[in-house]
Amino acid sequence: MGDVKLFASSHMSKTSHSVDPSKVSSMPLTEAPAFILPPRNLCVKEGATAKFEGRVRGYPEPQVTWHRKGQAITNGGRFLLDCGVRGTFSLVIHTVREEDKGKYTCEASNGSGARQVTVELTVEGNSMKKRDQPVLSKASGFPGETRPSIWGECPPKFATKLGRAVVKEGQMWRFSCKITGRPPPQVTWLKGNVPLQPSARVSMSEKNGMQILEIRGVTRDDLGVYTCMVVNGSGKASMSAELSIPGLDNASRLAVRGTKAPSPDIRKEVTNGVSKDPETVAESKNCPSPQRSGSSARATNSHLKSPQEPKPKLCEDAPRKVPQSSILQKSTSTITLQALKVQPEARVPAIGSFSPGEDRKSLAAPQQATLPTRQSSLGGSVGNKFVTGNIPRESQRESTFPRFESQPQSQEVTEGQTVKFICEVSGIPKPDVGWFLEGIPVRRREGITEVYEDGVSHHLCLLRARTRDSRKYSCTASNSLGQVSCSWSLLVDRPNLAQTAPSFSSVLKDSVVIEGQDFVLRCSVQGTPAPRVTWLLNGQPIQFAHSICEAGVAELHIQDALPEDRGTYTCLAENAMGQVSCSATVTVQEKKGEGEREHRLSPARSKPIAPIFLQGLSDLKVMDGSQVTMTVQVSGNPPPEVIWLHDGNEIQESEDFHFEQKGGWHSLCIQEVFPEDTGTYTCEAWNSAGEVRTRAVLTVQEPHDGTQPWFISKPRSVTATLGQSVLISCAIAGDPFPTVHWLRDGRALSKDSGHFELLQNEDVFTLVLKNVQPWHAGQYEILLKNRVGECSCQVSLMLHNSPSRAPPRGREPASCEGLCGGGGVGAHGDGDRHGTLRPCWPARGQGWPEEEDGEDVRGLLKRRVETRLHTEEAIRQQEVGQLDFRDLLGKKVSTKTVSEDDLKDIPAEQMDFRANLQRQVKPKTISEEERKVHSPQQVDFRSVLAKKGTPKTPVPEKAPPKAATPDFRSVLGGKKKSPSENGGNSAEVLNVKAGESPTPAGDAQAIGALKPVGNAKPAETPKPIGNAKPTETLKPVGNTKPAETLKPIANAQPSGSLKPVTNAQPAEPQKPVGNAKSAETSKPAGKEEVKEVKNDVNCKKGQVGATGNEKRPESQGSAPVFKEKLQDVHVAEGEKLLLQCQVISDPPATVTWSLNGKTLKTTKFIVLAQEGSRFSVSIEKALPEDRGLYKCVAKNSAGQAECSCQVTVDDAQTSENTKAPEMKSRRPKSSLPPVLGTESDATVKKKPAPKTPTKAAMPPQIIQFPEDQKVRAGEPVELFGKVAGTQPITCKWMKFRKQIQESEHIKVENGESGSKLTILAARQEHCGCYTLVVENKLGSRQAQVNLTVVDKPDPPAGTPCASDIRSSSLTLSWYGSSYDGGSAVQSYNVEIWDTEDKVWKELATCRSTSFNVQDLLPDREYKFRVRAVNVYGTSEPSQESELTAVGEKPEEPKDEVEVSDDDEKEPEVDYRTVTVNTEQKVSDVYDIEERLGSGKFGQVFRLVEKKTGKIWAGKFFKAYSAKEKDNIRQEISIMNCLHHPKLVQCVDAFEEKANIVMVLEIVSGGELFERIIDEDFELTERECIKYMRQISEGVEYIHKQGIVHLDLKPENIMCVNKTGTRIKLIDFGLARRLENAGSLKVLFGTPEFVAPEVINYEPIGYATDMWSIGVICYILVSGLSPFMGDNDNETLANVTSATWDFDDEAFDEISDDAKDFISNLLKKDMKNRLDCTQCLQHPWLMKDTKNMEAKKLSKDRMKKYMARRKWQKTGNAVRAIGRLSSMAMISGLSGRKSSTGSPTSPINAEKLESEDDVSQAFLEAVAEEKPHVKPYFSKTIRDLEVVEGSAARFDCKIEGYPDPEVVWFKDDQSIRESRHFQIDYDEDGNCSLIISDVCGDDDAKYTCKAVNSLGEATCTAELIVETMEEGEGEEGGEEEEEEEE
């Protein structure tokens, strides 16, 4: 189904809504658009700038368009549309006006399909709502106003309809329909109004997107109307169909149907974020009253009144005989809209909530609509809500709404076919039908498009479909009642014709013409695809001529021939297959009269012709540093002038920008592009006849390494009062760490103003606004930038004026000022001391700040909207999760922040300081010992509004004083105070003894349910504090539905003023404070008792509250009943926990869940779901903290019911010494059970607690040690290690396992505090790893530091060699430097000497290790030498080459390096079976010469065999363990089986202690790809075939021996020498034997070349190597990598998806055989890949390379690929895909956090059955070879000071080998990972402990302990938690009172 649009129109307004189109079947290798980052809804102030932005992916690149009210938005004026790189796009609206508000639709489309997302712009006016305006509110299950969803979303839609069913008794019947919507809707089937339950006869299922209801053995009882109801967070829809049995009595059928809903219909409610005018809602579960929306509601009531109905009238289903107005949608689905008959201030129950009896009663009194369809009051209908009145029957017969009886369907046709779209339309008056293509009307065009009508059918006919007709089509039908539309797609495919090169069937003929005559040249050309024809005159393009090419005939028309027109005319025809040309000579005979000729010629010549571009610009994407040339061809008369512009500014010719002109060709050359050169380039050409321009976008891409900035915790909008101080806070991350910019209303904040302060604490940034003034209000933007990208977040600061004083006691206020239907009490309303509530509500359109924590209640009457908010949160998690591949292989992203996925669910309150503004630092009043013993119930006072300085005898007439501005520096970092400083009159009670339960303010337990948290015993009586006496308590609000229960304000002084606060965070155990005395005790937590309380909470009748005298209306319907109750559950830790129950109620109940009294909400870990009447809680992996009492409470207007169950979670590892649960479970804001165990051995701490016993003897610790250092040669170096522990401690420095002795260059100084090693002047031999070893009698520790001495490189090794000597040229080749000086060699300087001049001169500079020397003279001899160059300088020269003369060939030396290649003849190879020689040293048999290279394995040296003088390569390994030696022996064993000319041979091996040497044949030509990019190498497809044939031969032989290579990549394909094309495969270190191996799985490979089955940890085979060959071949022919991403994770994700293509222009020159060869190797299913034998028989490799055409291929892409690959390399030749833990778990804690559940991750431990498997996995991970080292910390954790509610993070880096296992401790107790404590440990040894939602109980010392088989290491730091409390001050900024009597 394509796009479906619903339109509702009247004379006042027209609204539309679009649903996501489903994909049309796409062509191969294409991808339909998908929004990676959808645009978000915006709320901005009038006059500000609004920016919608997002990111889309798809192939081809999608085109993004924006629509509003059905009209496309174009660039210009205040609207700016922009599409950036990598799918980013934006819509910017400058100077936003009121009329800009509303919905905007963003559509991304390409040839594969289209995708839409709808967002909303809310515009806030500059003035706040008038406070004296009477406002009405209505209780409802939905909030009257919530913030718009931040994600674009789609309400549910029906893509197909339910058909009416006529079925015989006993048969089976099936209803089916297809639905769409985002998030995916929940589906419920109903019969009548009763949800259907699965049974033996009835089943409900989903298949391929179709929802299916099956009824087997239909009986008469099954008769009736069946409804499919779909609901998501954006709205709901339903469709009904009737099941009937033929022959049944009509009367009985009518009786049955009379009680049901009409069929078929769709009932729909869409609340896309903001519900603005509920009076227009057609239907909802709890039918809303017209007062729900603020000020406009009262005006609307007059139109909604029904004079005939004195009592409130029910919203009810219209009986069948009452005509209805309907809007029809595609598939004849109907939205039924019925008039609302309501009285002012009346409650209107929901449609669909009545019993059949009630429905039958309504049949007797059909509704008479009193609401005219043209009523102007309906102009406010918003979004997707439609309304139309019920028209009287008489008028209804005359006019009906338009509807489609049949609709056009999407089609896929071949180019050239005829396409017909047909629809049938009905309606009275007869509808007008319009056809549209992409929103543009389609008209009749002769021979192309026909539009006609045939009776009731309307036809659109495309006579010859073309590919450009592949678009989205729509049809609208409209009459006076309204309009309906439908849409569909057409896909036109090109026929798959065999492509042929152009050819001429008739050619040009010579001709003779007379001057002034017209003549035509004509020829016929054919070819597939159709050739492009170009005309040339004497080899130059013809500028002033008219040429046409139609139906294969090409013509050139020349008018008024001139003598200049004589010459050779050529017609050039070309297509993708080739080109062909034909020529003819035209002779122009001059006329005799010269004067006459000149007279006639003059006007012809002077006739001006406007410029035209024969070739324009096209968009370019290049890498930073590339050279760019943009070329255009322009013609015109007179010749046009040309200028170039960049982003509208003229480009001046300079050193960087050059202009070139050659005839009509003009070029702009940029020598080296930089990122700032990105932009739009325009070429303008003009002459006297006109002007023309062409433009293109140049994008300069930078290779970035790092992470784009992002928000760990986003800031949130603030509502404040004048004079208050405000904090806006966020936590950020990014690599490199981003810079932070603060802006208000688009302008940067000026630091000179002094009105604000910017604070930073680690990654937390806070903006402090002191003494807020009106000009501080506005939209604040936090902009984060680093070199990878940028990110921003906007919040608003809104101000309320302080309300006037409260009315006297007992009097009801005239109105509830400022109320808006949203439901919450404003932040700063003041009331009198008797408790009269004066709420202050946000102005309309502002809404409340969006909450992510269900417990965080922002005011007294905030409505419960958890279901809505959870849905949005689920959308956010789902959409981001779909795109996040970071966990693909169980890897952690190496940033120093929590991963984005983890943070999606950290409540935003963790970084929210707004509620803490007036609080002092919590006194830390007792010692740590006492705190550990008592584990006090810490109380959260964030919502406390009572002030410390309240007078003991308050005066009723006097309003309480305003809060003073606190000093926020003391708030954030102030000192802690002793108990005496906060006397009994404090607003906060601290250190309550364990077991005491605080008293809530009043007894509103069911309605605000203030419950003790944790394991507080319910029977304990709370203790009142001070002299508090709660004389009045909060009262339940009359006429209020349970879904909006009253939240009492914790710690409010009941006898004082109630101050509701927006940012209050109650739901914590609280105690009354101040001058109050407890009148009665609180009820035990967990008992939901509704108490009548007496408190003057007065509001207008029918509004928020009601006084005790008022009557509550009688409830409608029945109270909820649990049909299926919760059952006790027992699960093991890590298993899935699922709790389900079924609730029957009328009207539908609101269901809330709680665990141990704490309300549950949907998070990443816990999912609350509803399917019809069934409610569930599911936890994918249960933890011990999930145990406890689960309670489900269902409420509706008629009552409530509850059921509960006990859940037990078995610990995976229960410590015997676990302390009593009470000790650590009473943490505020958490219901976590104990997560701390103890470990038998005491933790060694750096800083013991003050009252601990005398310090015990300690092993040595290295507490300070330098990082790795890099110094220039000649500079001094100091390495200092600071140590601690029991003396005496001995320190010694080691290098290469030998102790360093002092010398004239090196000094060592040892002292009690540490040891210092000083190198006076660093030289190259000082490079290496230095180890500090410290020892005492209790043990030893060591730490390592790498020292790199950078310098100019060593001279190139060996002697330069001349080869390929010709008459005047030769090829010079040489080895690279044996040491590069610590920085890569950038180039080589070649120097020359001859026998005549006898002076060394610089000849050339080149990057490779060979150079073709030209223009040599035969009469002299030459010598050469080479210098290497790096960033630090130029090396000394190499050895000099031998004297060489051109014109003769030197005698060939024995060294194979210098042997010219002969492709035909393989040299004799000396094959040997090698056994490891342990008797002799390698130096006994070979002379060891210069180093040739090094790698992770060791080093390679040139060896000369002493007996024969043959040259070999020696590969020297360091192998310390038996396992390492076995691994090398296995490689030698495998190489003994691989005797083949294309495989490098091992000829000898030696073992001596930890050294193993393999002697290999030398391959000196370098890596294959390096050879290809040499300047003297010409790359053609012929060379590619030669290389691939050799690779296939070599791998074929390996496979025949039962071996797989598993590391095929360009680095392991070596050229035999530098002149030929012979290659050899090397490096069999990862090779494995497949024979007898069973099912072999591996965990290693190079991401770019590894096969999908390796990543997915599936069995491998010989075909695994074939995938790698396919990747190598793809890169070889194109220079492009099919799967390379910006990092390894992205690359691996690309490989697993196995999507690639040949779309790049690089493949234009590549033959189809080559593409077929690659295609048959890059198959995701390994069974479908070619094997080596099939490869060698493939037509491509069978081609005759001697005689085939050799078309030169570009090497530019290959050079860029090689540069990028070098940049991406991390230094290890093989990167491990997975890293596994090698040790057992300590205290139930895994040392490395395992994969977070990627289904393809090989890291799940279940896959490794034994310790041998683990060891094998480690071996396969190919970790760098290094000696075993005890654990030590190269970076230790540091003390932290954080504010309560934020997140804390300890970071350290752990070194050691084998990899240490890690355990964390809180004080003396080991920490088990949970949702509160998260532990990250990555491959690089970075380990983090993240504590989310920090509270006072987390204030402790934390220790990280690292253990391996050689020892252990620890480091310790302290976490200080600062708890904020309310402060009090007088106006004028007086100091807060410290103490009161």
From Swiss-Prot:
Residues 1356-1449 form the Fibronectin type-III domain. Residues 936-951, 1733-1796 are annotated as: Calmodulin-binding. Can probably be down-regulated by phosphorylation. Tyrosine phosphorylation by ABL1 increases kinase activity, reverses MLCK-mediated inhibition of Arp2/3-mediated actin polymerization, and enhances CTTN-binding. Phosphorylation by SRC at Tyr-452 promotes CTTN binding. One of its GO terms (molecular function) is metal ion binding. Residues 33-122, 156-244, 402-485, 502-587, 611-699, 709-809, 1120-1208, 1260-1348, 1831-1920 form the Ig-like C2-type domain. Residues 990-1049 are annotated as: 5 X 12 AA approximate tandem repeats. This is Myosin light chain kinase, smooth muscle. It comes from Mus musculus (Mouse).
